[in-house]
């Protein structure tokens, strides 16, 4: 699965895959894996892109807004971003990004994220 995700991310970054093509791969079960709890082990190198099936949660560790610390729960961040509701499932795109010097917390979609200083890894989520 990881090799397929890396190939798709490679072509996606270069604009060689349309959203419809990615969605078709997802629907056929070729692309998305179940989401890990967080991105601690996957947030390197910067630019690494994954597609995960996630079931939203409203409680759990969440630091940042739009860009989250590597140890933030993917399920909670997805609800905070408004990509999925708690208890519902969706496929999300997760990209490892350079960590900012500071993570700003906020309240969104029934989830409160928290401020945090420097952290070694970070990611952002997007709808597919």
Task: Tell what function each PLM region has.
Residues 1-23:
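Membrane-proximal basic amphipathic "stem/tether" segments
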């Amino acid at each position: 699965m990881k090799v397929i995700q890396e190939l798709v991310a490679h072509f996606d970054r270069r604009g060689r895959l349309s959203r419809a093509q990615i969605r078709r791969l997802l629907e056929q079960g070729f692309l998305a894996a179940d989401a890990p709890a967080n991105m601690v082990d996957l947030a390197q190198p910067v630019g690494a892109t994954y597609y995960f099936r996630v079931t939203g949660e409203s409680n759990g560790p969440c630091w940042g807004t739009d860009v989250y610390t590597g140890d933030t729960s993917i399920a909670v961040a997805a609800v905070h971003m408004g990509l999925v509701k708690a208890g519902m499932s969706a496929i999300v795109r997760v990209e490892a990004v350079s960590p900012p010097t500071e993570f700003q917390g906020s309240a969104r979609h029934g989830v409160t994220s928290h401020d945090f200083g420097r952290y070694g890894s970070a990611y952002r989520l997007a709808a597919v």
